[in-house]
Amino acid sequence: MKTKLDFFKMKEQNEPIVMLTAYDYPSAKQAEKAEVDMILVGDSLGMVVLGLDSTIQVTIDDMIHHTKAVKRGAKDTFIVTDMPFMSYHYSLAETLKNAARIMQESGADALKLEGGDGVFESIQALTRGGIPVVSHLGLTPQSVGVLGGYKVQGKDHESAQKLIEDSLKCEEAGAIALVLECVPGELTKRITDMLKIPVIGIGAGAEADGQVLVYHDVVGYGVSRTPKFVKQYAQIDTLLEEALIQYTKEVKAHTFPEDKHTFHIKEEVLDGLYGGIKK
Protein backbone atom coordinates (compact mmCIF):
# COMPACT_ATOMS: atom_id res chain seq x y z
CA MET A 1 0.00 0.00 0.00
CA LYS A 2 1.24 3.48 -0.86
CA THR A 3 1.89 5.92 1.98
CA LYS A 4 2.27 9.66 2.43
CA LEU A 5 5.92 9.42 1.39
CA ASP A 6 4.98 7.66 -1.83
CA PHE A 7 2.55 10.45 -2.72
CA PHE A 8 5.21 13.09 -2.04
CA LYS A 9 7.62 11.17 -4.27
CA MET A 10 4.99 10.95 -7.02
CA LYS A 11 4.60 14.72 -6.90
CA GLU A 12 8.37 15.20 -7.12
CA GLN A 13 8.58 12.85 -10.11
CA ASN A 14 5.53 14.37 -11.80
CA GLU A 15 3.66 11.05 -11.68
CA PRO A 16 -0.10 11.71 -11.57
CA ILE A 17 -1.94 10.48 -8.48
CA VAL A 18 -5.20 8.66 -9.20
CA MET A 19 -7.93 8.97 -6.59
CA LEU A 20 -11.43 7.54 -6.92
CA THR A 21 -14.39 7.45 -4.57
CA ALA A 22 -15.80 4.14 -3.39
CA TYR A 23 -18.66 3.59 -0.98
CA ASP A 24 -18.96 -0.19 -0.69
CA TYR A 25 -17.14 -3.51 -0.99
CA PRO A 26 -17.60 -4.19 -4.74
CA SER A 27 -16.68 -0.68 -5.90
CA ALA A 28 -13.61 -0.68 -3.64
CA LYS A 29 -12.57 -4.07 -4.96
CA GLN A 30 -12.85 -2.83 -8.54
CA ALA A 31 -10.95 0.36 -7.72
CA GLU A 32 -8.09 -1.61 -6.21
CA LYS A 33 -8.04 -3.97 -9.17
CA ALA A 34 -7.70 -0.89 -11.42
CA GLU A 35 -4.66 0.10 -9.31
CA VAL A 36 -5.88 3.52 -8.23
CA ASP A 37 -3.49 5.18 -5.78
CA MET A 38 -6.07 6.41 -3.27
CA ILE A 39 -9.70 5.70 -2.48
CA LEU A 40 -11.88 8.45 -1.06
CA VAL A 41 -14.89 7.45 0.99
CA GLY A 42 -16.59 10.79 0.52
CA ASP A 43 -19.62 12.09 2.33
CA SER A 44 -21.00 12.40 -1.20
CA LEU A 45 -22.23 8.89 -0.44
CA GLY A 46 -25.22 10.64 1.09
CA MET A 47 -26.46 11.75 -2.30
CA VAL A 48 -24.93 9.03 -4.47
CA VAL A 49 -25.94 5.88 -2.59
CA LEU A 50 -28.28 6.97 0.22
CA GLY A 51 -30.53 9.23 -1.82
CA LEU A 52 -30.15 12.25 0.47
CA ASP A 53 -30.46 15.83 -0.73
CA SER A 54 -26.98 16.89 0.40
CA THR A 55 -23.93 15.83 2.38
CA ILE A 56 -25.18 17.71 5.44
CA GLN A 57 -27.36 14.78 6.57
CA VAL A 58 -24.49 12.27 6.53
CA THR A 59 -23.42 11.07 9.99
CA ILE A 60 -20.27 9.68 11.57
CA ASP A 61 -21.97 6.28 11.75
CA ASP A 62 -22.61 6.44 7.99
CA MET A 63 -18.95 7.19 7.29
CA ILE A 64 -17.73 4.39 9.53
CA HIS A 65 -20.17 1.86 8.06
CA HIS A 66 -19.20 2.58 4.46
CA THR A 67 -15.48 2.89 5.14
CA LYS A 68 -15.42 -0.53 6.80
CA ALA A 69 -16.99 -2.03 3.68
CA VAL A 70 -14.49 -0.23 1.45
CA LYS A 71 -11.58 -1.40 3.59
CA ARG A 72 -12.69 -5.01 3.18
CA GLY A 73 -12.67 -4.59 -0.59
CA ALA A 74 -9.40 -2.66 -0.85
CA LYS A 75 -7.06 -3.87 1.86
CA ASP A 76 -3.95 -2.68 0.00
CA THR A 77 -5.07 0.80 -1.07
CA PHE A 78 -4.68 4.06 0.88
CA ILE A 79 -8.15 5.06 2.08
CA VAL A 80 -9.19 8.61 2.91
CA THR A 81 -12.49 9.14 4.74
CA ASP A 82 -14.46 12.37 5.05
CA MET A 83 -15.25 13.76 8.45
CA PRO A 84 -18.93 14.63 8.00
CA PHE A 85 -20.75 17.91 8.55
CA MET A 86 -20.11 19.60 11.94
CA SER A 87 -18.05 16.67 13.27
CA TYR A 88 -14.97 18.91 13.55
CA HIS A 89 -16.37 22.33 14.45
CA TYR A 90 -17.69 22.28 18.03
CA SER A 91 -14.33 22.05 19.82
CA LEU A 92 -10.87 20.55 19.38
CA ALA A 93 -11.69 17.96 22.03
CA GLU A 94 -14.83 16.91 20.16
CA THR A 95 -12.92 16.90 16.87
CA LEU A 96 -10.23 14.62 18.27
CA LYS A 97 -12.83 12.32 19.80
CA ASN A 98 -14.75 12.01 16.52
CA ALA A 99 -11.60 11.57 14.45
CA ALA A 100 -10.23 8.89 16.75
CA ARG A 101 -13.50 6.98 16.58
CA ILE A 102 -13.60 7.07 12.78
CA MET A 103 -9.98 5.94 12.49
CA GLN A 104 -10.30 3.16 15.07
CA GLU A 105 -13.63 1.76 13.92
CA SER A 106 -13.40 2.21 10.14
CA GLY A 107 -9.81 1.36 9.29
CA ALA A 108 -9.26 4.59 7.33
CA ASP A 109 -5.68 5.68 6.64
CA ALA A 110 -6.42 9.42 6.65
CA LEU A 111 -9.29 11.84 7.20
CA LYS A 112 -10.43 14.66 4.92
CA LEU A 113 -11.57 18.00 6.31
CA GLU A 114 -13.30 20.68 4.27
CA GLY A 115 -12.64 24.38 4.60
CA GLY A 116 -10.01 26.92 5.56
CA ASP A 117 -10.84 29.43 8.28
CA GLY A 118 -11.73 27.68 11.51
CA VAL A 119 -10.29 24.36 10.35
CA PHE A 120 -6.53 24.99 10.52
CA GLU A 121 -6.43 24.32 14.27
CA SER A 122 -8.25 21.03 13.73
CA ILE A 123 -5.69 20.00 11.11
CA GLN A 124 -2.89 20.81 13.54
CA ALA A 125 -4.54 18.94 16.41
CA LEU A 126 -5.21 15.81 14.37
CA THR A 127 -1.69 15.87 12.94
CA ARG A 128 -0.20 16.15 16.44
CA GLY A 129 -2.41 13.23 17.43
CA GLY A 130 -0.94 11.09 14.65
CA ILE A 131 -3.90 11.27 12.28
CA PRO A 132 -3.02 12.10 8.64
CA VAL A 133 -5.22 14.86 7.24
CA VAL A 134 -6.19 15.67 3.66
CA SER A 135 -7.51 19.21 3.26
CA HIS A 136 -10.30 20.23 0.87
CA LEU A 137 -10.66 23.76 -0.51
CA GLY A 138 -12.54 25.48 -3.31
CA LEU A 139 -16.08 24.20 -3.64
CA THR A 140 -16.71 22.53 -0.30
CA PRO A 141 -20.08 20.72 -0.42
CA GLN A 142 -20.64 20.89 3.34
CA SER A 143 -20.63 24.70 3.02
CA VAL A 144 -22.56 24.93 -0.24
CA GLY A 145 -25.29 26.97 1.44
CA VAL A 146 -22.79 29.62 2.50
CA LEU A 147 -21.07 29.56 -0.90
CA GLY A 148 -24.36 30.19 -2.69
CA GLY A 149 -24.61 26.89 -4.53
CA TYR A 150 -22.39 24.63 -6.58
CA LYS A 151 -20.27 27.27 -8.29
CA VAL A 152 -16.67 27.61 -9.46
CA GLN A 153 -14.54 29.17 -6.71
CA GLY A 154 -11.59 31.55 -7.01
CA LYS A 155 -12.58 33.36 -10.21
CA ASP A 156 -11.96 36.89 -8.90
CA HIS A 157 -8.77 38.33 -7.40
CA GLU A 158 -9.94 38.36 -3.80
CA SER A 159 -11.25 34.80 -3.68
CA ALA A 160 -8.30 33.48 -5.69
CA GLN A 161 -5.84 35.11 -3.29
CA LYS A 162 -7.77 33.64 -0.36
CA LEU A 163 -7.53 30.16 -1.86
CA ILE A 164 -3.77 30.53 -2.23
CA GLU A 165 -3.40 31.71 1.35
CA ASP A 166 -5.64 28.97 2.72
CA SER A 167 -3.76 26.32 0.74
CA LEU A 168 -0.47 27.43 2.26
CA LYS A 169 -2.02 27.45 5.73
CA CYS A 170 -3.34 23.91 5.26
CA GLU A 171 0.15 22.73 4.35
CA GLU A 172 1.65 24.62 7.28
CA ALA A 173 -0.92 23.06 9.62
CA GLY A 174 0.27 19.60 8.62
CA ALA A 175 -2.03 18.38 5.85
CA ILE A 176 -0.50 15.58 3.78
CA ALA A 177 -2.45 16.50 0.63
CA LEU A 178 -4.97 19.01 -0.66
CA VAL A 179 -8.11 18.47 -2.72
CA LEU A 180 -9.11 21.45 -4.87
CA GLU A 181 -12.67 21.35 -6.21
CA CYS A 182 -14.17 23.52 -8.96
CA VAL A 183 -11.25 25.92 -9.23
CA PRO A 184 -9.92 27.53 -12.44
CA GLY A 185 -7.09 25.50 -13.93
CA GLU A 186 -4.70 28.44 -13.91
CA LEU A 187 -5.19 28.93 -10.18
CA THR A 188 -4.76 25.21 -9.57
CA LYS A 189 -1.38 25.33 -11.33
CA ARG A 190 -0.28 28.28 -9.20
CA ILE A 191 -1.22 26.51 -5.99
CA THR A 192 0.23 23.18 -7.11
CA ASP A 193 3.56 24.82 -7.91
CA MET A 194 3.64 26.61 -4.56
CA LEU A 195 2.88 23.63 -2.33
CA LYS A 196 5.17 20.80 -1.32
CA ILE A 197 2.21 18.52 -0.60
CA PRO A 198 0.29 16.84 -3.46
CA VAL A 199 -2.69 18.71 -4.88
CA ILE A 200 -5.54 16.55 -6.19
CA GLY A 201 -8.10 18.22 -8.40
CA ILE A 202 -11.75 17.63 -9.16
CA GLY A 203 -13.02 20.09 -11.69
CA ALA A 204 -9.74 21.95 -11.21
CA GLY A 205 -7.98 21.42 -14.52
CA ALA A 206 -5.10 19.23 -15.63
CA GLU A 207 -2.28 20.92 -13.73
CA ALA A 208 -2.87 19.34 -10.33
CA ASP A 209 -0.69 16.50 -9.05
CA GLY A 210 -3.62 14.11 -9.35
CA GLN A 211 -7.30 13.74 -10.11
CA VAL A 212 -10.33 12.45 -8.23
CA LEU A 213 -13.79 11.63 -9.54
CA VAL A 214 -16.86 9.92 -8.15
CA TYR A 215 -16.99 6.21 -9.03
CA HIS A 216 -20.61 6.38 -10.17
CA ASP A 217 -19.89 9.33 -12.47
CA VAL A 218 -16.94 7.52 -14.07
CA VAL A 219 -18.90 4.36 -14.87
CA GLY A 220 -22.29 5.96 -15.54
CA TYR A 221 -24.11 4.27 -12.68
CA GLY A 222 -27.19 5.83 -11.10
CA VAL A 223 -26.50 9.36 -12.29
CA SER A 224 -29.06 11.45 -14.17
CA ARG A 225 -26.66 14.26 -15.00
CA THR A 226 -22.96 14.89 -14.59
CA PRO A 227 -20.97 18.09 -14.05
CA LYS A 228 -18.91 19.63 -16.86
CA PHE A 229 -15.66 18.33 -15.38
CA VAL A 230 -16.74 14.66 -15.44
CA LYS A 231 -15.79 12.22 -18.18
CA GLN A 232 -17.89 9.05 -18.30
CA TYR A 233 -15.93 5.99 -19.34
CA ALA A 234 -18.93 3.64 -19.43
CA GLN A 235 -22.73 3.58 -19.28
CA ILE A 236 -23.40 0.90 -16.69
CA ASP A 237 -26.98 2.11 -16.21
CA THR A 238 -27.90 0.99 -19.72
CA LEU A 239 -26.49 -2.50 -19.19
CA LEU A 240 -28.20 -2.83 -15.81
CA GLU A 241 -31.55 -1.71 -17.15
CA GLU A 242 -31.38 -4.16 -20.06
CA ALA A 243 -30.43 -7.02 -17.75
CA LEU A 244 -33.18 -6.32 -15.23
CA ILE A 245 -35.85 -5.91 -17.91
CA GLN A 246 -34.82 -9.23 -19.45
CA TYR A 247 -34.90 -10.93 -16.03
CA THR A 248 -38.42 -9.62 -15.40
CA LYS A 249 -39.63 -10.78 -18.81
CA GLU A 250 -38.21 -14.29 -18.39
CA VAL A 251 -39.73 -14.81 -14.96
CA LYS A 252 -43.13 -13.61 -16.21
CA ALA A 253 -42.83 -15.90 -19.25
CA HIS A 254 -41.80 -18.94 -17.16
CA THR A 255 -38.53 -19.20 -19.11
CA PHE A 256 -36.41 -18.66 -16.00
CA PRO A 257 -35.26 -20.66 -14.19
CA GLU A 258 -34.36 -23.39 -16.67
CA ASP A 259 -33.43 -26.93 -15.72
CA LYS A 260 -29.73 -25.98 -15.65
CA HIS A 261 -30.49 -23.50 -12.87
CA THR A 262 -32.34 -26.08 -10.75
CA PHE A 263 -31.13 -28.55 -8.11
CA HIS A 264 -32.58 -32.09 -8.07
CA ILE A 265 -32.95 -35.03 -5.71
CA LYS A 266 -33.43 -38.66 -6.61
CA GLU A 267 -37.00 -39.78 -7.30
CA GLU A 268 -36.93 -42.49 -4.63
CA VAL A 269 -35.94 -39.90 -2.02
CA LEU A 270 -38.79 -37.66 -3.09
CA ASP A 271 -41.26 -40.58 -3.01
CA GLY A 272 -40.23 -41.39 0.54
CA LEU A 273 -41.06 -37.93 1.84
CA TYR A 274 -44.32 -37.06 3.61
CA GLY A 275 -46.97 -36.69 0.93
CA GLY A 276 -45.03 -38.85 -1.47
CA ILE A 277 -46.36 -41.73 -3.59
CA LYS A 278 -47.55 -44.69 -1.53
CA LYS A 279 -46.56 -48.08 -2.88
UniProtKB/Swiss-Prot annotation:
PANTHER family: 3-METHYL-2-OXOBUTANOATE HYDROXYMETHYLTRANSFERASE. CDD domains: KPHMT-like. The active site is at 181 (proton acceptor). Homodecamer; pentamer of dimers. Catalyzes the reversible reaction in which hydroxymethyl group from 5,10-methylenetetrahydrofolate is transferred onto alpha-ketoisovalerate to form ketopantoate. It comes from Bacillus pumilus (strain SAFR-032). This is 3-methyl-2-oxobutanoate hydroxymethyltransferase. Mg(2+) binds at residues 43, 82, 114. It catalyses: 3-methyl-2-oxobutanoate + (6R)-5,10-methylene-5,6,7,8-tetrahydrofolate + H2O = 2-dehydropantoate + (6S)-5,6,7,8-tetrahydrofolate. Belongs to the PanB family.
